[in-house]
Amino acid sequence: MSDIVNGLGRTTAYGALGLVLLVLGIVLVDILLPGRLGRQIWEERNRNAAVVLSSALLGVGGIVFTSIWTTYDDFGKGLVSTAVFGLLGLVMMAVAFLVLDLITPGRLGATLVEQEPHPAVWVTASCNLAVSAVMCASIA
């Protein structure tokens, strides 16, 4: 019975940490894109912003999953390493976004929240997923 309780505690801790990292991912995308992300997606139904946010969430989820899956036997060390890898993944995705913005014409953030579909959205989403895949491979 204590194994179940112990497992529930660990699952709750990792789950809460994962949720915090996902929320930080939402905040990060909201900071990088002009305007209010929630309003753009839920009220204005902006597909471009939704694709960028979705790719960031999938990326963060993949990083957290890989970090938990390959975690240390020591619970505390595993929890800290998951937090650190998750935060590093967020930083790396932000840096990749800023580099992409630097090397492409115009302001990438403004382009990504246009109402009309734009190919830059798919490039940005792919960049998020690629950075996350590299992070996952590095963790594993």
Per-segment meaning from a language model:
Residues 24-43:
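Membrane-interface helix-loop junction between the first two transmembrane segments
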Residues 18-26, 89-97, 128-132:
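Alpha-helical transmembrane segments of multipass membrane proteins
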Residues 86-114:
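Alpha-helical transmembrane segments and their immediate juxtamembrane interface regions
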Residues 48-68, 129-131:
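A generic, lipid-embedded transmembrane alpha helix
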Residues 3-21, 77-92:
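Alpha-helical transmembrane segments
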Residues 39-51, 109-125:
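Membrane-interface segments at loop-to-transmembrane junctions
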Residues 1-5, 38, 68-79, 110:
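Membrane-interface helix termini and inter-helical loops of multi-pass transporters
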Residues 133-140:
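Juxtamembrane boundary at the C-terminal end of a transmembrane helix
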